[in-house]
């Protein structure tokens, strides 16, 4: 059994670690509230944009944009949104597992895949497994700007425009609540039709100002940008929630470990005292 001094040192070490995890939990909780506000403010725009695009996909358009046409699928692209920092539980690895399963399914059909990565955890993971990475951005911080995301988005849109990609997906975590974050893979291009039943039974038509091509070229790029930005802010909220939960679990586990070490320490002290008393009694008897 370890000595009492060694056990006291372990208890002090766990207590110091517990203070750190508690502080990180509180910081994550504060950041989560801020990111939730940002996510909530951008979500209506992204959802409305998605509905408008759904209408367009079902409509009788004067100008047929290439983003609306289904193609024979030979190569698929993914915009992957992960975190820059760790200590977020299984948030990233669950997302990566879901993506790898989807990529394996496409590869089984003879379809190639390539990735544009947002977040250092995605960069390190997919480079280590040998995936084809065509663009990457890291160091987004806690307040990501759309201008910082444009690089990977432009690379994938250019590949789609030139016919080097036939489908484009965004891969990120959807924030449900503090305890639940769901990895999801959403199709961006070609534009998915609206899913609502009442929209499918209607025939949509539009009048354009100034002209269909100018309007659709701008609108469809704004749509892609809005979906990527929303994916980033939702993933950021998911990151802070997962980190808060992970740090709380670590703090609670630290408390349990301290109790166990305290019990071991008490037993060690008891053994030491008993041994000292025995030695005193033995010495007295010898005299």
Swiss-Prot record:
Q: Where are the transmembrane segments?
A: none
Gene Ontology cellular component annotations, sorted alphabetically: plasma membrane; proton-transporting ATP synthase complex
Coarsely, its chief localization is membrane
How is the protein disposed in the membrane?
A: Peripheral membrane protein
Q: Where in the cell is it found?
A: Cell inner membrane
- Record keywords, A-Z: ATP synthesis, Cell inner membrane, Cell membrane, CF(1), Hydrogen ion transport, Ion transport, Membrane, Transport
Keyword check for Cell membrane, yes or no. yes
Supply one GO BP term. proton motive force-driven plasma membrane ATP synthesis
This protein's record includes keyword Zinc: no
Gene Ontology MF annotations: ATP binding; proton-transporting ATP synthase activity, rotational mechanism
InterPro entries to which the protein is assigned, alphabetical: ATP_synth_F1_ATPase_gsu, ATP_synth_F1_gsu, ATP_synth_F1_gsu_CS
SUPFAM superfamilies to which the protein is assigned, alphabetical: ATP synthase (F1-ATPase), gamma subunit
| Family the UniProt entry places it in | Belongs to the ATPase gamma chain family.
- How is the quaternary structure described? F-type ATPases have 2 components, CF(1) - the catalytic core - and CF(0) - the membrane proton channel. CF(1) has five subunits: alpha(3), beta(3), gamma(1), delta(1), epsilon(1). CF(0) has three main subunits: a, b and c.
Biological role stated in the UniProt entry: Produces ATP from ADP in the presence of a proton gradient across the membrane. The gamma chain is believed to be important in regulating ATPase activity and the flow of protons through the CF(0) complex.
What HAMAP family is this protein classified in? ATP_synth_gamma_bact
Query: What name appears for this protein in its UniProt entry?
Result: ATP synthase gamma chain
| Gene designation | atpG
């Amino acid at each position: 059994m370890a000595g009492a001094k060694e056990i006291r040192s372990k208890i002090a070490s766990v207590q110091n670690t517990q203070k750190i995890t508690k502080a990180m939990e509180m910081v994550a909780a504060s950041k989560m509230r801020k990111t939730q506000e940002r996510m909530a403010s951008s979500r209506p725009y992204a959802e409305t944009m998605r509905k408008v695009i759904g209408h367009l996909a079902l409509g009788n358009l004067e100008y047929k944009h290439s983003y609306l046409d289904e193609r024979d699928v030979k190569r698929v692209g993914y915009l992957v949104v992960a975190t820059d920092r760790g200590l977020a539980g299984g948030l990233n690895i669950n997302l990566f597992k879901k993506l790898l399963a989807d990529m394996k399914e496409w590869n089984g059909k003879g379809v190639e895949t390539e990735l544009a990565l947002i977040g250092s955890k995605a960069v390190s993971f997919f480079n280590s497994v040998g995936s084809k990475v065509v663009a990457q951005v890291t160091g987004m911080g806690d307040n990501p700007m759309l201008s910082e995301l444009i690089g990977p988005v432009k690379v994938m849109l250019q590949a789609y425009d030139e016919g080097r990609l036939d489908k484009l997906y965004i891969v990120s975590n959807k924030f449900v609540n503090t305890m639940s974050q769901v990895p999801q893979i959403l199709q961006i291009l070609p534009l998915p039709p609206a899913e609502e039943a009442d929209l499918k039974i209607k025939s949509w038509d539009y009048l354009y100002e100034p002209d269909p091509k100018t309007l659709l070229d701008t609108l469809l790029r704004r749509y892609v940008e809005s979906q990527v930005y929303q994916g980033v802010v939702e993933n950021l909220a998911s990151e802070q929630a997962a980190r808060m939960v992970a740090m709380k679990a670590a703090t609670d586990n630290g408390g349990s470990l301290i109790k166990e070490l305290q019990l071991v320490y008490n037993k060690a002290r008891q053994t030491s005292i008993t041994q000292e008393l025995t030695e005193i009694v033995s010495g007295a008897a010898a005299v």
